[in-house]
C-alpha cells in the first residue's frame, strides 16, 4: 500500500514500515490474549491499518505541512518550532490529514473502516488524552462491531512504547541527513531502553545508559504511565469493565547499571577480594 501511495504522492518518505511492526508487536504484548483472539476481522484490520498509517505523515514537505497545520488549527502552537520539531510533534495528526485527503486510493472496505482508522490516529496524535471524545463502538453493515475506544486505547499505548524503544538522546533529527549508515546503526545499538516485557500483569521497562540519558527515558516513561492511568480510568468509568482489552494493570521502570558502572563495580569487587586475601 505504501508503494502505491508513494507513486501517487511522491513527497512522502517511506519511514513507517519498521515502526509499524514495533507498534503492532507492542499492541500484541499489552493486550489480553483471550480478548485478542476474540477480536473480529474488522477490528484487527482497523487496528493494524491504524498502526501502519500512524507515521506516514513524517515525510511531508514544508508546503504540505503548512497546509495541514492550518487545517488542524495549530498555527499558534507551532510558531516557535523548527520544521523538524513540528514534524516530530504532530506527524501522526498529519498522517490522519493524509488519509482524510487521499485515503480513497487504499480502497478501504467501507467508509466506516476509514473513519475508524482516522479517528484512532487523531486520538494518538493528541497523546491519547481525549478518549471520552471517541465513539464507544461502530456497527458495520455485516453487523460486526468495531470497539473504537478499546482499540484506540491499546494503539495509543503501543505507539508510545514503540517510540520509547528507539529513544536516543545522542541522535539529532535536525542533522539526521548528515549521518552515514554506520553512525545510525551505532546509535541504535546504544539505545537506552534495553527491554520491554510483561511480568505478572506489569509492563516492565528496563533502561540503562548515562545519567542524562536515563533521566530522559524516565521522563518519557512517567508520561506514558500518566497517560495509561488516564486511559484506564476513562475506560473504567463504564459499567462493563470487561471490555477493557489490556492485559497489564501497571507500568514500571527499572534501571540497569551502565557498562561503565558495571565495570567499576566489578573492579571494586576484585579489589575487595584481593584485600581480603
How would you name each of these model-derived features?
Residues 5-12, 80-81, 203-211:
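Glycine- and acidic
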Residues 1-78, 258-277:
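Acidic/His-rich, divalent-metal-binding segments that scaffold phosphate/diphosphate chemistry
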Residues 28, 32-35, 100, 104, ...:
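A general structural signal for alpha-helical elements within enzymatic catalytic domains
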Residues 18, 22, 153, 223, ...:
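Charged, amphipathic alpha-helical oligomerization/scaffolding segments
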Residues 5-12, 128, 161-168, 231, ...:
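Short secondary-structure junctions and interdomain/linker hinges
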Residues 175-277:
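C-terminal effector/catalytic modules and regulatory tails appended to multi-domain proteins
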Residues 15, 87, 216:
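Catalytic cores of large soluble enzymes that bind and process phosphate-bearing ligands
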Residues 35-201:
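Divalent metal-dependent catalytic cores for phosphoryl transfer on phosphate-bearing substrates
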Amino acid at each position: 500500500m505504501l508503494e502505491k501511495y508513494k507513486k501517487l504522492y511522491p513527497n512522502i518518505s517511506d519511514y513507517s514500515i519498521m515502526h509499524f511492526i514495533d507498534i503492532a508487536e507492542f499492541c500484541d504484548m499489552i493486550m489480553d490474549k483471550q480478548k485478542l483472539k476474540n477480536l473480529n476481522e474488522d477490528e484487527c484490520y482497523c487496528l493494524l491499518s491504524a498502526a501502519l498509517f500512524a507515521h506516514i505523515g513524517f515525510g511531508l514537505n514544508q508546503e504540505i505541512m503548512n497546509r495541514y497545520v492550518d487545517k488542524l488549527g495549530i498555527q499558534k502552537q507551532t510558531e516557535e518550532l523548527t520544521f523538524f520539531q513540528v514534524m516530530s510533534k504532530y506527524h501522526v495528526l498529519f498522517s490522519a490529514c493524509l488519509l482524510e485527503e487521499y485515503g480513497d486510493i487504499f480502497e478501504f472496505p467501507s467508509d466506516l473502516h476509514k473513519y475508524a482508522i482516522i479517528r484512532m490516529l487523531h486520538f494518538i496524535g493528541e497523546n491519547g488524552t481525549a478518549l471520552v471524545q471517541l465513539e464507544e463502538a461502530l456497527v458495520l453493515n455485516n453487523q460486526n462491531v468495531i470497539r473504537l475506544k478499546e482499540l484506540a486505547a491499546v494503539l495509543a499505548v503501543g505507539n508510545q512504547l514503540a517510540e520509547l524503544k528507539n529513544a536516543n538522546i545522542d541522535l539529532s533529527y535536525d542533522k539526521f541527513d548528515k549521518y552515514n549508515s554506520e553512525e545510525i546503526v551505532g546509535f541504535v545499538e546504544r539505545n537506552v531502553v534495553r527491554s520491554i516485557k510483561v511480568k505478572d500483569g506489569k509492563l516492565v521497562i528496563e533502561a540503562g545508559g548515562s545519567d542524562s540519558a536515563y533521566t530522559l527515558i524516565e521522563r518519557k516513561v512517567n508520561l506514558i504511565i500518566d497517560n495509561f492511568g488516564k486511559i484506564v480510568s476513562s475506560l473504567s468509568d463504564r459499567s462493563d469493565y470487561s471490555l477493557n482489552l489490556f492485559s497489564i494493570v501497571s507500568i514500571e521502570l527499572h534501571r540497569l547499571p551502565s557498562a561503565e558502572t558495571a565495570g567499576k563495580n566489578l573492579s571494586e569487587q576484585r579489589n575487595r577480594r584481593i584485600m581480603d586475601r
